[in-house]
Amino acid sequence: MDSNHSKMAIAFYLRANLKACCAVMIFLFGLLPSHCFAQDLPDNGPDIGLLMLGKAYIYKLHPEDMAGKGYILIYIVSAPLSAYWNFKTDFGSDFLLTNKLITEHRVVENKNNVAITETIYATKPGVKFRWRTISSPETHRLDFELLNPKECGQRFHYGHIQLEKVAEYTKVTQIAYFDFFGASFWMNYPWYGGMKYHLYHMAKWEQETIPRLLHKYR
C-alpha cells in the first residue's frame, strides 16, 4: 500500500511540474506576440500587413560556404527612409546607450562612409566588439563586419542591412553570417542572451526610439 501511495505521489508530482513547465513556456512565448521565428524564409516573404503593424520576423539562413550559421531579420519602422538612414548612420550618438543591451559604445574612426566602432554588450560584459560599417547612401545599404572575431570568441561575423521605402515607413532587412563555439545553441536559445531575444529587442528598441527622434533626423 505504501509503495502504491509513493508511486501515485511521484506521478502526481511529475504531472504537476510538467503542467507548470508548460504554463511557463506558454507565458514566456506569449510575451512575444509581435515576433515570429521560423526555419526558412518563405518564397513570398513575410506578411507585409503584419510588418506594418510592427511584427518582426527572423528566418534561418545557410551560410554561403556552409560553415557557421546565418539569419535574416525583417521589420518596419515608423519613419521615412531619409530620416531612418540618418538615424542608422549616426554612429556616435548617445541615444545608443538607451538600449539596455549596450553598455558601452564609441566611434574609433568615421570617414569616407566607413565607420569603425567599439561596442560592449550587456550579454558579454568586458568584451569589445570592433565593427567596421560601410555606408552606401545611394542604395541605402550598410555592410558590417566584426574586425576582432578572435577577441570576441568568434571565427567570423559579417552581414549587411538593406533599407527600403514602404509608403511613409522604412522596411529593414538585416542579414548576417557568423560562427563560434555554441553558435547553434545561441541561435535557438529563446531567452535573455540568445540570438532571438537580442534581435527582437534591437528591432523593438528601434521601432520605439526612432519616432521620438524624428525631429532630429528629418
Regions from the PLM with identified roles:
Residues 78-82, 109-112, 134-140, 162-171:
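A short, structured loop/turn motif at beta-sheet edges
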